[in-house]
Design a protein with these regions (language model features):
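Acidic, metal/ion-coordinating pockets
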Residues: 2-334
């Protein structure tokens, strides 16, 4: 009698949470003049909407305001001073495209005073999304039965958790970890432009502002229990690092800046970062989906993979032996 041999055991695939994240997002402004697109959802997102789909969570840094407040807190007559105001109705577009949570901790969220900041938070919530970035606040959400906490930081001390106050950030992460299984960090920090391409383990300054030591901050927050660190603010992509099994993305660059961002040089290199984490927060795998920005700041897929090549180079240069493996097709492995 011949007995059938038992089928070999196949290891179950690790259940993961998939996050997709993009950097700085401005859909246009109607202040001080009208720089808004016609048919905004189609004109701004049609080329990248398929790439944004398919995640359990979709995140962006919303670097504008959603308000009708008439006067700005900034003197835009001074050189290199900009104020962004986007119609509140545009919040629904972001929801329809698929965004789940937006950071409002950045240097434009107070462009229209506290009222504009409060309006932005209210309009994001009314559209069915969540936000992170209020000082002292932790945003909780549940995905696949797992409680996730988000904490947003910037260099703006008054309204946001500050990148330079590391001990306060550590305390927030420890507080979040009491209720959440995973803690995700969004940070608007670091200097801007070409000279800021490389990550350095030192305080970064930009026009006299202290923009944080992002290496020290990310490591301290992960030591305290954070599981993912998403950076934005330098307006160009930066290196990736793996620290204690957690992924650090030091900058995702510009994602969308309709007629408001410079897209010259690395300012036009963009991406959608895809990250898979296990239920304990360990980095499992990821992918760089490279994008390019048009002269008007509209994203589309980049067939030349320039962003992937740039981030490969930066990761090897800035974190030799400490970065994840970035393959030529954009796949990221521990």
């Amino acid at each position: 009698m011949v007995l059938n041999a038992p089928a070999p055991l196949v290891p179950a695939e690790t259940e993961t949470i998939k996050i997709k994240a993009v950097g700085d997002l401005v859909m246009g402004t109607n202040y001080p003049d009208n720089r808004l697109p016609a048919d905004p959802r189609k004109s701004l997102f049609s080329d990248v909407e398929p790439t944004l789909r398919g995640a359990d969570l979709l995140f962006a840094n919303f670097e504008s305001t959603l308000t009708d407040y008439p006067t700005s807190s900034k003197n835009i007559n001074r050189p290199l001073i900009f104020a962004f105001r986007t119609p509140p109705s545009y919040a629904k577009i972001l929801k329809d495209v698929g965004f789940d949570i937006l950071s409002i901790a950045n240097n434009h969220s107070l462009d229209f005073h506290q009222q504009g900041f409060d309006d932005t938070a209210k309009n994001i919530s009314s559209a069915g999304m969540r936000f992170t970035g209020k000082k002292g606040a932790i945003t909780y959400m549940t995905v696949k039965g797992i409680t996730i906490a988000w904490i947003g930081f910037s260099h703006m001390k008054a309204a946001h958790n500050n990148v330079n106050e590391i001990s306060e950030g550590v305390a927030l992460v420890k507080e979040a970890k009491k209720k959440a299984q995973l803690v995700f960090i969004s940070v608007h920090g670091g200097a801007e432009g070409g000279p800021a391409l490389h990550v350095k383990n030192e305080q970064e300054r930009f026009y006299g502002e202290y923009r944080g030591n992002l290496v020290a901050l990310s490591h301290a927050l992960i030591d305290a229990g954070a599981d993912l660190f998403i950076g934005h603010g330098p307006h160009l992509p930066r290196a990736l690092e793996l620290y204690r099994g957690r992924l650090i993305a030091y900058s995702l660059g510009n994602f969308l800046g309709y007629r408001v961002f410079s897209t010259k040089g690395y300012g036009g290199y963009s991406l959608v970062l895809e990250v898979d984490l296990d239920k304990n927060g360990n980095f499992v795998k990821g992918k760089i989906h490279p994008l390019q920005l048009s002269q008007n700041g509209i994203p589309s897929p980049d067939p030349e993979n320039k962003t992937t090549e740039l981030m490969q180079s930066l990761t090897k240069a800035d974190f030799p032996g400490k970065g994840p493996k970035i393959q030529n097709d954009g796949t990221i492995l521990p």
